[in-house]
Curated annotation (Swiss-Prot):
Function: May play a minor role in antagonizing the type I IFN-mediated antiviral response. Additionally, NS1 may serve some inhibitory role in viral transcription and RNA replication.
Family: Belongs to the pneumovirus non-structural protein 1 family.
GO CC entries: host cell mitochondrion
Keyword terms of this UniProt record: Host cytoplasm, Host mitochondrion, Host-virus interaction, Inhibition of host innate immune response by virus, Interferon antiviral system evasion, Viral immunoevasion
Protein name as annotated: Non-structural protein 1
Species this protein is from: Murine pneumonia virus (strain 15) (MPV)
C-alpha cells in the first residue's frame, strides 16, 4: 500500500527528478528529502513541483501540509544543485527516465519570484 511521489526541479532550462515510494509520510520526511539540497538566498528562475502518483487520500493530506510548511519556512529562498540531469532515482538505485503519466496530480508548485 502507499503511493509514489515525484519531485521536479526546473533550473536554467534543465529539469531534475526525484521519485520515491511512501507508505506513511509526515513533514519530517519531506524535510529530510530537501535537507540534501543546497539552499540559496536568492531566486534564480527556478521551480519546484511535487506530484502525487496514485490516489491514496490518507497520504495526500500530510504531504500537502508538509509541502506548505516547506514553502512557508523557505519563502524567498530556492534550491540549487539538487541533481544535474534528467533521471529518476528509484528505490533500487537504478537510473531511469522520468515517467510521463498524465494522471499525476500536482500537489504544490513553488515558483521563484
Amino acid at each position: 500500500m502507499g503511493c509514489n511521489v515525484m519531485m521536479e526541479l526546473d533550473y536554467g532550462g534543465r529539469a531534475a527528478w526525484l521519485a520515491f515510494h511512501i507508505t506513511n509520510f509526515d513533514r519530517s520526511d519531506l524535510e529530510t528529502i530537501l535537507r540534501g539540497a543546497r539552499v540559496c538566498n536568492t531566486w534564480q528562475d527556478q521551480r519546484l513541483s511535487v506530484y502525487l502518483v496514485g490516489r491514496d487520500c490518507n497520504l495526500l493530506r500530510p504531504f500537502v501540509q508538509a509541502a506548505k510548511f516547506i514553502h512557508n519556512t523557505r519563502r524567498g529562498q530556492t534550491l540549487t544543485h539538487w541533481f544535474t540531469k534528467n533521471i529518476v532515482f528509484s528505490s533500487t538505485g537504478q537510473e531511469t527516465e522520468p515517467p510521463i503519466d498524465p494522471t499525476c496530480e500536482l500537489l504544490v508548485e513553488l515558483i521563484s519570484g
